[in-house]
Structures are given as structure tokens and as C-alpha cells.
Amino acid sequence: MPEGKIIKALSGFYYVLDESEDSDKVIQCRGRGIFRKNKITPLVGDYVVYQAENDKEGYLMEIKERTNELIRPPICNVDQAVLVFSAVQPSFSTALLDRFLVLVEANDIQPIICITKMDLIEDQDTEDTIQAYAEDYRNIGYDVYLTSSKDQDSLADIIPHFQDKTTVFAGQSGVGKSSLLNAISPELGLRTNEISEHLGRGKHTTRHVELIHTSGGLVADTPGFSSLEFTDIEEEELGYTFPDIREKSSSCKFRGCLHLKEPKCAVKQAVEDGELKQYRYDHYVEFMTEIKDRKPRY
């Protein structure tokens, strides 16, 4: 039976991109009753086996094992996430970026940081601050790009990342995710709204999750991570989602060190020595407190 990937889910129909070589055929499929019975919901991003009824319609027969699964947005088998943050309007926030990075890392998704609206910076201090932060994150090992959707050349280095990958765009509302995607692939024609001056953040303009062909891969312009809570991350797992902390933690005296009040902690020493940025450690402590204070689930 043929195989494919769900690229859109709408009103009980699943649109499957046929995975045959050089095929761009999309089949409209319904799920089998067995999925409902077993409480399995097909998701955008699922690799599936389907049975074709004709050239345009069919039935989902099997859902392959997922490498990861996001709840909000409901999508799975994501290879990478482009985290879009604006330099200004709204202001750049390392705390919010680190929160997104933790959630992405926890799902084994490769993050790419994109700071947009560089053309809207009006003073040198802000420019210098953004450049310094970009260098900090590059030193951790992240790909960081400074862009403007009006400057096509600033986007050129991002485009090769999309080849043969399933990519999610995420980030603060109002930072220009749709504008950025439209600049990369003008044929998408995604809706963009002006930023809401009153709220200081943009209105969500994306209605549903859909994987769209662009630059040799599949890209989802999602409503973003509408939930930024650490509901599935445990205390001992948090450090692994900070690559810079993870690297230093191997030198801690005690196994299971949470880098809070433990003696001979290599992470705290690295902060003191300037090898680990204070703001990164502060965010780690803030997130750890949040996880510790989380109400138990039964």
C-alpha cells in the first residue's frame, strides 16, 4: 500500500502528500474507525500508510511511529523550529527565547534562532545589545540569523536549512513570522496583520496548521506555541535542555546536581568565572522554580 505524510487536517479529512518518488499528489483521506476506538488522533506531520479509493480519495490504514509530538500546535515529526523574535516592536526578550528553547530542546527539535526587524532599530545601543546576544547564542552552538523581511539578502542563509526538513515557525506574536515566510516564499501569500500598538503584541493571523512546500522542504506556519508551560519537563531534565549548562554539569561533584544550592557545583562556578552567562543561569533557576511549584497531576 502507498505511504505518505499528512500535510493538512480539516473537518475530519486528512490530506496526505504521497511519498512516491517525484510525486506531488495529495490524497484526501478519512481515518478508520479503529483510530477513534484506540483513541489515536492522526496529526499533521504523521507518516501514514493509506489505501487509495481513486486518484483523489482514500483511507488511512496505519500511522507510523512518531519521533516527537507537539500539543499546541498539534503537529508531529518536526525536524527543526525557526524561533522568530523581533529586535524591536516588540522588544527582544532573552527570557522568552530561553523558554522557547527549553520546549524545543525537550522535544528533540533542532532550534534555529531568527531575530527579525533589524531594519527598525533606531539607536546604536540597541543594535550593539542585539549583536551581543546573537553572539552569546552562537557560542552556545545555536544557528542565529539577524534579518529583515524587507532585505532579501539577509534571508539567503536561512533558506538552505529548509531542504528535506519539516520545519515549524514559532515565536512571540507580532514578530513577523508570516512576513518572514512570505519573504522566503512570496507565493505563500500568508495573512499578516499590523502589530497592535495597544497590546504591544500582534494579533494571531494563522488559523490552522498546514505543511506547505517551500525551499525543498515542508514548513508549517503555526499559531505558535500557545502554551509555554513546562508541563512535561521534570526537575532533573531541565538542565539537559540548556546545552551550555549540560556541558558544565558533567564536572559537578554530585550526580543529580540541580545547580541550585549544592556544594562544588561546576555550573555555579562557571557563572562566577564568566564562562556561563548570568542571564542564562537566572532563567534556569526561574524555570526550575516554576517546575518545582507545579501542581502534581493525578
From Swiss-Prot:
Q: Which UniProt keywords apply?
A: Cytoplasm, GTP-binding, Hydrolase, Metal-binding, Nucleotide-binding, Phosphoprotein, Ribosome biogenesis, RNA-binding, rRNA-binding, Zinc
Residues at which GTP binds: T116, K117, M118, D119, G171, Q172, S173, G174, V175, G176, K177, S178, S179
Task: Indicate whether Hydrolase appears among the record's keywords.
Answer: yes
Which CDD domains does the annotation name?
Answer: S1_YloQ_GTPase, YjeQ_EngC
Task: Tell me the PROSITE patterns matching this sequence.
Answer: ENGC_GTPASE (PS50936), G_CP (PS51721)
Location of the CP-type G domain: 67-228
How many cofactors are bound and how? Binds 1 zinc ion per subunit.
Task: List the GO cellular component terms.
Answer: cytoplasm
Query: Which post-translational modifications are recorded for this protein?
Result: In vitro phosphorylated mostly on Thr (with lower signal on Ser) by PrkC in the presence of poly-L-Lys or myelin basic protein, dephosphorylated by PrpC. Most in vitro phosphorylation occurs on Thr-166, in vivo phosphorylation has not been detected, but it might vary during the cell cycle.
Quote the EC number. 3.6.1.-
Q: Impact of changing T166A on the protein? A: Loss of most phosphorylation by PrkC, GTPase activity less stimulated by 70S ribosomes than wild-type, decreased association with 30S ribosomal subunit in vitro. Grows slowly, cells have abnormal morphology
Task: Report the gene knockout effect.
Answer: Has been described as essential, but also as non-essential. Cells have a slow growth phenotype. Disrupted strain grows as chains of filaments, a cell curvature phenotype is also present, resulting in long wavy cells or short curved rods. Depleted cells form aberrant, swollen cells. Depleted cells DNA staining shows fragmented and/or disturbed nucleoid segregation; effects are seen most in minimal E-medium. Depleted cells have an irregular deposition of cell wall and 15% have abnormal septal cleavage planes.
Cofactor(s) essential for the protein: Zn(2+)
Which positions in this protein are listed as binding Zn(2+)?
Answer: C252, C257, H259, C265
Q: Which residues carry this modification: Phosphothreonine?
A: T166
Give GO terms: molecular function aspect only: GTP binding; GTPase activity; metal ion binding; rRNA binding
Check the record and name the Pfam families matching this protein.
RsgA_GTPase, RsgA_N
- Top-rank taxon: Bacteria
What are the recorded Gene Ontology BP terms? ribosomal small subunit biogenesis
Similarity-based family:
Belongs to the TRAFAC class YlqF/YawG GTPase family. RsgA subfamily.
- Free-text function comment from the UniProt entry: One of several proteins that assist in the late maturation steps of the functional core of the 30S ribosomal subunit. Helps release RbfA from mature subunits. May play a role in the assembly of ribosomal proteins into the subunit. Circularly permuted GTPase with a low level of activity and slow catalytic turnover, does not act on ATP. GTPase activity is stimulated by the presence of 30S or 70S ribosomes, phosphorylation increases stimulation.
Q: Subunit composition? A: Monomer, but able to form dimers. Associates with 30S ribosomal subunit; a phospho-mimetic mutation increases association. Probably binds 16S rRNA.
Question: What is the designated name of this protein?
Answer: Small ribosomal subunit biogenesis GTPase RsgA
Which species expresses this protein natively?
Bacillus subtilis (strain 168)
